[in-house]
Amino acid sequence: RHIVELGNAGLIFIYDELEADTAVTWSYLLHTIEHPMIIKNDKGVMHITATNAGGMSDAYLFANDKLETKQTDQFFYPAVNWLRADDKGYFAPYKNHWHFTATSPHSPVYRFATVVSTHGQGSAGVVPEKISKDTLKAGGWIIKMNISPKGKATFTIENKAENIVLEYDGSTKITEEGRTVILKDQVPELEI
């Protein structure tokens, strides 16, 4: 999973590259605590809106195939509060949350791309525009990506006005105002 914050406009780009030894279904999950999500399929783009008291997020999910979707207010397995007790040692049970799942057809390789636009209630967020099969425009950002299971997992994000280019092609190359940095992906050590 690659996550890129696109400037300070409340935009986030997420690119998931998934591989298995055999053909399996891949699931993309989103969750909210209080309200159900609004799910629309706008011209082949899955648009999921989540709200809370302080604001809202619009997730635009791009995939190579039609995805099977569902939403539930039940946990897959009951969530057990084992961490937060009150001063008398009582562990209050968790209330159910809302869970959205988009499932792919069977494939050994799959890729999802998502643009998330966060904004206040009543204000319009940035809506990504699909320019071509593999290119999006979101605000001042142009995103070229391979979401097909064929070919290499790759994406490029560019903002000409800000003089920024980010390229992912096995390693991440960031060019900002003429200065280039190359990052190599690594699995983080988890502190549990």
Q: Which residues are covered by each model-predicted region?
A:
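CBM-like, beta-strand-rich accessory domains located in the C-terminal region of large
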Residues: 1-192
